[in-house]
């Protein structure tokens, strides 16, 4: 249902209008906020940063890990992730082609060596899984899973209920602005935005995203949407649809190499997220912090994404603060009617949902 609404919004150019009306300073801020957000995700995935009841979050405690007997299951993976960040950073600094991919492979290989030598001891109970490919099912290990149990298994029994409407609208809101935020961030990093902040040929990208959402639902998968990891492809020079098509072909081939890809651990992919975050944050240099009515909303957008753990919340904070700050400082000419409407919608969401 959400995907169908997306298609309608894309065909009627509503999504494009929302994208175009967001000020360029906020588009730059979205790129920075996404960078901090995915870097935080990477640090959490690697357990370099962990939850803490006293301070909310904290760095991993190696001493506690050693004394608690978890160093060889969790502590060593944190060490490997830190090494992976260094390796990936060096690769990028030396302008090595495919540096992020080589960083993942190098960290994975180090993990395999640690498991083989006994330095890393897998324990699924604490989320420490084996990093060795599992071929126990023989040739069946290389065959894609049977989609028939979930393919076209749609349930329309609750369509007329209020709860269903609330869920659809909630998903629509989050996915709508997450996708726009990702497009803003990646396009900004790729220097594809025009001087007025608009993006050429955005309608095709939005339609592809909408159709992907519908196709994913029919296949029974989680939402197929635009991912911020696309920035890693942009950093390697990807700019056209050929990049996306090539990626799709490789994804298809990966279905038949599942044992290898499923063995790649979180501590090997986390450094990639951290470094992609760095690439995204570089857009902060393009924000004019001397222009406070533009800079303050950009700042609110940036800090909201990692702290609220949501791209859409960052956009919400940015737009609402932009409307308020510019209206109350006499810069109403910068605020279009659509921005006022969006600000009201965001505020209503916080009150009603």
Where do the model's predicted regions map?
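Inter-helical loop and helix-membrane interface segments of multi-pass membrane transporters/permeases
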Residues: 17-27, 36-90, 117-156
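Helix-loop-helix hairpins and the membrane-proximal interhelical loops
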Residues: 60-66, 104, 108-203, 344-348
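Membrane-helix interface "capping/anchor" motifs
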Residues: 90-101, 235-241, 282-293, 308-312, ...
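Loop-to-transmembrane alpha-helix initiation sites
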Residues: 25, 29, 74-80, 99-101, ...
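Hydrophobic alpha-helical transmembrane segments of multi-pass membrane proteins
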Residues: 5, 22, 26, 71-75, ...
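Hydrophobic core segments of alpha-helical transmembrane domains in multi-pass membrane transport
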Residues: 2-10, 32-47, 78-93, 103-116, ...
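Helix-boundary and loop/linker segments of multi-pass membrane transporters
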Residues: 71-75, 153-163, 198-199, 288-292, ...
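Helix-loop-helix junctions within the multi-pass membrane cores of secondary transporters/permeases
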Residues: 1-34, 185-284
């Amino acid at each position: 249902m959400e995907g169908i609404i997306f298609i309608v919004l894309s065909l009627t150019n509503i999504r494009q209008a929302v994208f175009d009306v967001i000020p360029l300073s906020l588009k730059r801020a979205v790129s920075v906020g996404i960078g901090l957000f995915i870097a935080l995700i990477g640090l959490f995935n690697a357990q370099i940063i962990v939850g803490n009841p006293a301070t909310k979050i904290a760095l991993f405690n190696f001493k506690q890990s050693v004394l608690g007997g978890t160093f060889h299951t969790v502590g060593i993976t944190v060490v490997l992730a830190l090494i992976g960040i260094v390796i990936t950073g060096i690769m990028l600094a030396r302008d090595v082609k495919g540096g992020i991919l080589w960083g993942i492979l190098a960290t994975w290989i180090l993990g395999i060596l640690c498991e083989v030598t006994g330095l890393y001891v897998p324990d699924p109970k604490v989320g420490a899984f084996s990093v060795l490919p599992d071929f126990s099912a023989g040739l069946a290990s290389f065959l894609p899973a049977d989609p028939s149990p979930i393919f076209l298994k749609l349930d329309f029994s609750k369509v007329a209920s209020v709860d269903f409407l609330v869920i659809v609208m909630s998903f629509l809101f989050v996915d709508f602005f997450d996708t726009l935020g990702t497009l803003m961030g990646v396009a900004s990093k790729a220097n594809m935005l025009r001087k007025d902040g608009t993006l050429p040929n955005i309608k095709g990208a939005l339609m592809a995203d909408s159709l992907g959402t519908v196709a994913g639902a029919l296949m029974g998968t989680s939402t197929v949407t635009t991912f911020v990891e696309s920035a890693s492809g942009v950093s390697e020079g990807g700019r056209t649809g050929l990049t996306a098509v090539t990626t799709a072909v490789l994804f298809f081939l990966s279905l038949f190499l599942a044992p290898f890809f499923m063995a790649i651990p979180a501590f090997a992919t986390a450094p990639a997220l951290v470094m992609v975050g760095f690439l995204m944050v570089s857009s902060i240099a393009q924000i004019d912090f001397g222009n406070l009515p533009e800079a303050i909303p950009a700042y609110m957008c940036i800090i909201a994404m990692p702290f609220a753990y949501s791209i859409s919340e960052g956009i919400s904070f940015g737009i609402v603060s932009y409307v308020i700050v510019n209206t109350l400082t006499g810069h109403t000419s910068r605020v279009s009617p659509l921005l006022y409407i969006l600000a009201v919608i965001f505020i209503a969401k916080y009150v009603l949902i």
